[in-house]
Amino acid sequence: MARYRHSRSRSRXRYRRRRRRRSRYRSRRRRYRGSRRSRSRRRGRRRGYSRRRYSRRRRRY
């Protein structure tokens, strides 16, 4: 556990440099209108996505 704590403090630093890049990414993401929606969509894809796709195909036929 102590080892993990040490690595965490080390990443902090690193996070500071990363923060600058993240702000730029955020501004670009803000341009997209459904950024929040895309996130939820990703979650749905992970949960039983194949099943939804199959049902859609069946409906089309």
From Swiss-Prot:
Protein family per UniProt: Belongs to the protamine P1 family.
Entry function: Protamines substitute for histones in the chromatin of sperm during the haploid phase of spermatogenesis. They compact sperm DNA into a highly condensed, stable and inactive complex.
Spans traversing the lipid bilayer: none
Keyword Nucleus found: yes
Main location group: nucleus
Designated name of the protein: Sperm protamine P1
Gene Ontology CC annotation, any one: nucleosome
Coiled coil: none
Keywords per UniProt: Chromosome, Developmental protein, Differentiation, DNA condensation, DNA-binding, Nucleosome core, Nucleus, Spermatogenesis
Region (Disordered) location: 1-61
GO biological process, one term: spermatogenesis
GO molecular function, one term: DNA binding
Location within or outside the cell: Nucleus; Chromosome
Tissue-specific expression: Testis.
